[in-house]
Amino acid sequence: MAREFSRTRRIGQQLQQELAFVLQRDMKDPRIGMVTVNDVDVSRDLSHAKVYVTFFEEDPQVIEAKLAALNTAAPYARTLVAGRMKLRVMPELRFIYDASLVEGMRMSNLVSKVIRDDEAKKGHIGDEPQEGQREED
């Protein structure tokens, strides 16, 4: 019977927490700035980990530069996290930009805009006199 949470998933969750802490407190690279660790996907043999991150930037060039800086600093981040976690093998980190949060916010804004437009149209249509009604001056 399979466990509800596999070992790789538990390690991924702990790695996510430790990376978030290390990136906020210990990494002093100004090129990285504010970064959010959304998820960590660890391979079954614990040799590699994909770290999904987002930034508070929307410019694709800035995002690419920050992602490149993170991937350059990945060995240092790996060393810092290895000191905080008790693992025999520390996965090699690979940072990947996660656009799902930004895309979700964009979709939410679109839905809100459509709802506002519909309500405005209903209000505008309701203001017009219908057949059989007269406007009073």
Swiss-Prot record:
Entries under Pfam families matching the protein: RBFA
SUPFAM superfamilies: Ribosome-binding factor A, RbfA
Cystine crosslinks: none
GO biological process, one term: maturation of SSU-rRNA
Name of the molecule in the record: Ribosome-binding factor A
Record organism: Shewanella amazonensis (strain ATCC BAA-1098 / SB2B)
HAMAP family: RbfA
Role, per record: One of several proteins that assist in the late maturation steps of the functional core of the 30S ribosomal subunit. Associates with free 30S ribosomal subunits (but not with 30S subunits that are part of 70S ribosomes or polysomes). Required for efficient processing of 16S rRNA. May interact with the 5'-terminal helix region of 16S rRNA.
InterPro entries: KH_dom-like_a/b, RbfA, RbfA_dom_sf
GO MF annotations, alphabetized: ribosomal small subunit binding
Entry GO terms, CC: cytosol
Subcellular location: Cytoplasm
